[in-house]
Amino acid sequence: MENNELVNTNINYSPCILNTCSFGNIINNNEIEIFVSGKNKAKSKSFLHYLTYDFNSKDETQKKETTLLFQTWNETPSKTVNYIIPIRINNSQNESQNSLLSSGAFIFSSQLELLLNNNDDYNLYQIDDDIYIKPNIENDIIYGLVLDIGLKIFDLAKKETKSILYPGRKHIINDYFISSDNKNIIFACEDRKIYVYDKTDGKSFISKPNKMEINQVCEGSNDGKKFYGYSDEDYTLYLYDIRNFNQFVDVVKQDVEITKMFYNKACQQLFFLEFGSEAIISIDSIKQESIYESHKMIKDFGFQEQQKFMNIITEDNSINIISL
C-alpha cells in the first residue's frame, strides 16, 4: 500500500454520535479489531461496538460487526468516555479468553460500577470518585486517574486496587503515561511539576516547577528515555529527557490548542490534533508536516502500530482508516 492510502471510508455511524475509535489486535493475519464507542441519537443510549475488518480487501462485505456493550443509564453520565482500552483478559493458565475489556464500558460518573459487559458477573469495582482511564500496557492491570487524588491501579486478576500517592500531598493530575520499558509512570500536575514513579522500587522523583503548566504528556522515543509535554498556556510542545527531566527543549509552538497527541513507535514520530482541525500533523526532529487532511473536522484518532494503520473519526461520525 502507498503511504496514506485510504483503506476504507464506508464505516459510517451517521445516526449516532461517536466518541472514540481504537484498534485492537490483528487476527487471522488479515483482520483488524476495531472498537467504537458513542451514543445513539434517537434512543439516547450509550454503546460500544466491536467489529473486525479485512484490511486486505476493500469489499464492504468483509466487515463483521457485533454489539459488545449496549448499556442504558437512567441518568446521563456527567462525562462521556474518552479512551477505549482493548485488553484480553487472561485466566490463571495464561490462556487467552474471548472476554474483551474496554474503557467504553467504563463511565466517569460517581457511584457507578465499572462494567465489562451486561453480565453482572463481570462487575469489578464500585468507584466513588470521577475516574479517567487511559490505555495500559500490562495484561490484567488497569491504570485509572482519580481526579484530585492520584493514580489508582486496578488489578483484574486479584480484583483489588491500590493508590500511588506521594506522602503528605494531594495532587490534581492533568495527564500521565507509562514508559515503553514498563518501568516508569510519568505524571503532569497542576502545580507545574512533573512526577516520575518508578514501578520497580516504588521511588518517586519530582521535577522543579516548569514555567508553564503541562497539560499533556506522552512517550517521546522508542527507548523510553524521552517524553513530550504540552502546555495549553503557551501552546508549546516540550521534549524532556527522563534521565534528567528538569532539562527540556522547545520543540514547536502552535497557534491553537492541541487536543490530542500520540507517539507512534513504528513511525518514530509524534502525531497530534489541533482544536477544530481537519488534519493530523506529525513531527520528528527534522520537520513538521500534515500527514492526513479530511476536509472535515476531526474528532479523534488512534493507531494500530503493528501494521501502521491509523483510524480517524470525523464530524460526520464516520470512521476513516488509512495506511501510514
For the regions a language model picked out, list residue spans one by one.
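Beta-propeller domains
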Residues: 2, 35-71, 113-114
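A short beta-strand motif characteristic of beta-propeller blades
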Residues: 7-12, 67-75, 120-126, 160-166, ...
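Canonical WD40 repeat/beta-propeller blade segments in eukaryotic WD-repeat proteins
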Residues: 16-23, 78-88, 128-135, 170-178, ...
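Residue-level detector of Asp-centered blade-edge/turn motifs that repeat once per structural unit
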Residues: 25-30, 88-95, 137-139, 180-181, ...
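Conserved beta-strand element within WD40/beta-propeller blades
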Residues: 35-37, 41, 99-109, 142-146, ...
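Short coil/turn segments within WD40 beta-propeller repeats
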Residues: 41-48, 112, 148-152, 191-194, ...
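Short loop/turn segments that connect beta-strands within beta-propeller blades
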Residues: 54-56, 118-120, 156-159, 199-202, ...
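Blade-level signature of beta-propeller repeat domains, shared across WD40, Kelch, NHL, RCC1
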Residues: 299-324
